[in-house]
Amino acid sequence: MTNIRKTHPLIKIINETIIDLPTPSNISIWWNFGSLLGICLITQIVTGLFLAMHYTADITTAFSSVAHICRDVNYGWLIRSTHANGASLFFICIYLHVARGLYYGSYLQKETWNIGVILLMLVMITAFVGYVLPWGQMSFWGATVITNLLSAVPYIGDTLVQWIWGGFSVDNATLTRFFAFHFLLPFVISGASIIHLLFLHETGSNNPTGLNSDADKVTFHPYFSYKDMLGFLITLTTLAFLTLFTPNLLGDPENFTPANPLTTPPHIKPEWYFLFAYAILRSIPNKLGGVLALVSSILVLLLVPILHTSKQRGNTFRPITQMLFWALVADMLILTWIGGQPVEYPFMTIGQIASITYFSLFLILIPMTGWLENKAMNWN
């Protein structure tokens, strides 16, 4: 009798996705982050659902409803802290997942990569609208500053901003629609993740050597299902540690004050995971230029497959490109630090240099190095 796992129409799909999936035998722990992102997404949807049961999307009660969740709801403090810190962990996993793709040349699977970039943007939008919901000072002013950037769009800018606000300022209509978006988008992300996986399984996974691995593949289960569990354990332990010992470590103290349109916080800044993009935005003194740089800082990822010049796929055997990759990582960390600093000398200058370096690495230095490496190897 044939195994039901291989014949049942539904179970067969699951089987081909996570059980009998042919996987390169040499993939490292860096390939763990895809499944970790799945775990993060499920955690966020579950905790978010429970929070939505008690939250009220109205400017008069939003802040106090969050306080009510933390004080009066059974384990509400735990659900809220897990949701807030889960977002930070989600972004750590995303950035490591993207870094792995850049290092090992996974971006040459173009469809998977492009859907991945769209997923990144969807997650960033979801996190932004979610940050507005507690209706603290930083929530309100963050929403005001970031939505205001759309006024830089020529001709239709002001109309666009008012359309998003649902009025002439960030108000009740804005909060209500942001809650609607924050509730809806995770399910859109889930759907896009399935498409991401579908495209990935068309070609199969890349591996650390960047070579064809058809001759040496193993089943995903039990080898990598157990290997992934170690990653789950480490990630969930980190999340539990953050949530139970330092729940407010990554938050902004300003958000413990209810939103007040009449007083501006001394430093308006987003959550830590957006600071690199915020630093790039601030490094250009022109409003439209800053907005374009902000969007380009993410969309530049779409150009990576087009600008791949090397005859080799990954950076495993390319020491010069490896140096540039780690320079990019260092540059991102510098931008993250600068994004949290006030707009004054020397931070502005450092931010401008780091922003130029960021785009130069993607658009000029790494493609040129690939070409030079080909020349050095006589691979014309």
From Swiss-Prot:
Chief subcellular location equals mitochondrion
Q: How is the cofactor bound?
A: Binds 2 heme b groups non-covalently.
CDD domains attached here? cytochrome_b_C, Cytochrome_b_N
CC per GO annotation: mitochondrial inner membrane; respiratory chain complex III
Coiled-coil stretches, from where to where?
A: none
Recall the GO molecular function terms of this protein's record. metal ion binding; ubiquinol-cytochrome-c reductase activity
Name the residues that bind a ubiquinone: H201
Q: Which Pfam families match?
A: Cytochrom_B_C, Cytochrome_B
Subcellular location(s) per record: Mitochondrion inner membrane
Q: Which cofactor does it need?
A: heme b
Keywords attached to this Swiss-Prot or TrEMBL record, sorted alphabetically, are: Electron transport, Heme, Iron, Membrane, Metal-binding, Mitochondrion, Mitochondrion inner membrane, Respiratory chain, Transmembrane, Transmembrane helix, Transport, Ubiquinone
Which positions does UniProt annotate for heme b b566 binding?
H97, H196
For heme b b562, which residues are the binding ones?
H83, H182
- Annotated membrane topology: Multi-pass membrane protein
Function field? Component of the ubiquinol-cytochrome c reductase complex (complex III or cytochrome b-c1 complex) that is part of the mitochondrial respiratory chain. The b-c1 complex mediates electron transfer from ubiquinol to cytochrome c. Contributes to the generation of a proton gradient across the mitochondrial membrane that is then used for ATP synthesis.
Quaternary organization: The cytochrome bc1 complex contains 3 respiratory subunits (MT-CYB, CYC1 and UQCRFS1), 2 core proteins (UQCRC1 and UQCRC2) and probably 6 low-molecular weight proteins.
Q: What else is known?
A: Heme 1 (or BL or b562) is low-potential and absorbs at about 562 nm, and heme 2 (or BH or b566) is high-potential and absorbs at about 566 nm.
Family statement drawn from the similarity comment of this UniProt entry: Belongs to the cytochrome b family.
Q: What is the name attached to this protein's record?
A: Cytochrome b
User: Taxonomically, what lineage is the organism?
Assistant: Eukaryota, Metazoa, Chordata, Craniata, Vertebrata
